[in-house]
Amino acid sequence: MARKPLIAGNWKMNLDHQQAIGTVQKLAFALPKEYFEKVDVAVTVPFTDIRSVQTLVEGDKLEVTFGAQDVSQHESGAYTGEVSASMLAKLNCSWVVVGHSERREYHNESDELVAAKAKAALSNGISPIVCVGEPLEIREAGTHVEYVVEQTRKSLAGLDAAELANTVIAYEPVWAIGTGKVASAADAQEVCKAIRGLIVELAGDEVAEGLRILYGGSVKAETVAEIVGQPDVDGGLVGGASLDGEAFAKLAANAASVA
């Protein structure tokens, strides 16, 4: 089964709701329609930007999809500051990032919490982008494959085959995020292949063949084609390079060139 690459921009805590409109407009208009036939392009934006992006995408019938960067594991209730998956679903979010390394580090999010957030998203028709990846000391010790496979297993706990079929996994080596260091294409392939092997074990060949595994970690226009060209890498979770609409369009076009 040919997997259509997904290029997902993670804006992190950047761009207000007015800047968001201009950025998505530039992205959509800089990327000719035929490229959207080869790659799916998404932006995951701050909560305060979602309504503006939704109005633009739906009003102008843009091919770009959108989502959030986090979600509560709870459906509703006395959880001050939290945003539920049902709230995101009402805004027609297609995606939500869960377990990003910055959430794991700064908010002490565990694999168990990540799995609960993924479950909440799926229960509301939203595809989670489940992030996993090793820190530098694990990479240097040479145990990164085993580490990431086990982290992925725990971060997907409780999801059945049908839910996994609607899940995206993003491999983001922590040492390559925001540092300018980039894992080689071979590094990305090694781990993404092992993750796919885990999905075979959890859900069978058919689900594993269809599930998209992204690489995240200082993805740039110059490097994306080689990475996405690997057999088990199906796109990128793009940070800083997604904040400029035209630059992000170029990156997506480069990914489409190998699709």
Curated annotation (Swiss-Prot):
The keyword Isomerase applies. Gene3D superfamilies: Aldolase class I. Its main location: cytoplasm. Pathway: Carbohydrate biosynthesis; gluconeogenesis; Carbohydrate degradation; glycolysis; D-glyceraldehyde 3-phosphate from glycerone phosphate: step 1/1. GO terms for molecular function: triose-phosphate isomerase activity. GO terms for biological process: gluconeogenesis; glyceraldehyde-3-phosphate biosynthetic process; glycerol catabolic process; glycolytic process. Substrate binds at residues 10-12, 178, 218, 239-240. InterPro entries: Aldolase_TIM, TIM_sf, TrioseP_Isoase_bac/euk, Triosephosphate_isomerase, Triosephosphate_isomerase_AS. It is found in: Cytoplasm. The active site is at residues 100, 172. GO terms for cellular component: cytosol. Keywords: Cytoplasm, Gluconeogenesis, Glycolysis, Isomerase. Its EC number is 5.3.1.1. CDD domains: TIM. It catalyses: D-glyceraldehyde 3-phosphate = dihydroxyacetone phosphate. Belongs to the triosephosphate isomerase family. Homodimer. Involved in the gluconeogenesis. Catalyzes stereospecifically the conversion of dihydroxyacetone phosphate (DHAP) to D-glyceraldehyde-3-phosphate (G3P). This is Triosephosphate isomerase. The gene is tpiA.
